[in-house]
Amino acid sequence: MKILIISQYFYPENLRINDLVFSLKKRGHQIEVLTGKPNYPKGDYFKDYSWEGPIEEEIKGIKVHRANLILRKKGGGLRLFLNYFSFVFFGLFKILKLKNNFEKVFIYAPSPITVGILGVIAAKKFNCKSYLWVHDLWPESVRVAGGIKSGIILGLVNQMTKLIYR
């Protein structure tokens, strides 16, 4: 089966999605990953990565498409916001360029749920089902953990999550 995995984070970053991706590959699935440039958890590029590249690479037989993103570095909430949304912005261009006709789209969203936007777009483009592995339930986690009280912001987040969870 041809599967597109979308995750802001992927190898060499150390997250659970790596285990799933490599396991699916071992089971004979054709896997491609759309991800960001590795920078988690410190918020700065890993060795051998930069804004310039690599943009495409192969890791253990898996084609990896790397989207640029704004690094969060040691900045506060604004830098984190820019990091999340820049991955969605640059990831959108990557999806538009993808040629493979995927049968499934799998979205890994430890946080934020914004990566789900790319999954919705990819599933529509490839006319296939998408699956979402979410860790934080938005918008509730934004209100409680994020301390956001603005009705306007929470309303926008609520509309975005309804689109993604659908």
What label would you give each PLM region?
Residues M1-K60:
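N-terminal subdomain of nucleotide-sugar transferases
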Residues L4, E32-L34, H65, F106, ...:
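Hydrophobic/aromatic beta-strand patches that form the interior of the parallel beta-sheet core
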Residues F10, P38, L71, P112, ...:
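Short, glycine/serine-rich, charged loops/turns that create anion-binding
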Residues N14, F81-L92, K104-C128, L132-H135, ...:
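An aromatic- and histidine-rich active-site surface loop
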Residues T35-I95:
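A conserved catalytic-core segment of Leloir-type glycosyltransferases
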Residues G75-R79, V142-G147:
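Short acidic, glycine/proline-rich loop/turn micro-motifs
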Residues K97-F102:
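Glycine-rich phosphate-binding loop signature in dinucleotide/nucleotide-binding domains
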Residues T114, I121-F126, I152-R166:
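Membrane-proximal helix-turn-helix segments that form the acceptor-binding/catalytic region
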